[in-house]
Amino acid sequence: MPNMKVHIQFPEDKIKEPVIYQIGHEYKVVTNVRRADVRVTTGWMDLELTGDSTEIERAIVGLRKKGVIVDPIELNVVE
């Protein structure tokens, strides 16, 4: 099954929202947090999304619509 690794950054107003939970329920993707650093005012996460390629792309668009910055991780650097 296809997967994609992304680096996401949360602005302060999104830190307390269950964004990853929501994405896992709104789209047919499995989320796997590989690394993270979440503080009171900001946070980042390396996230692996697994599922159909179309659903992965929809989930990324959904994250961006929620105000989260999403960048692809090149060369599987979280391994």
Where are these predicted regions, by residue range?
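Long, contiguous binding/interaction regions
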Residues: 1-79
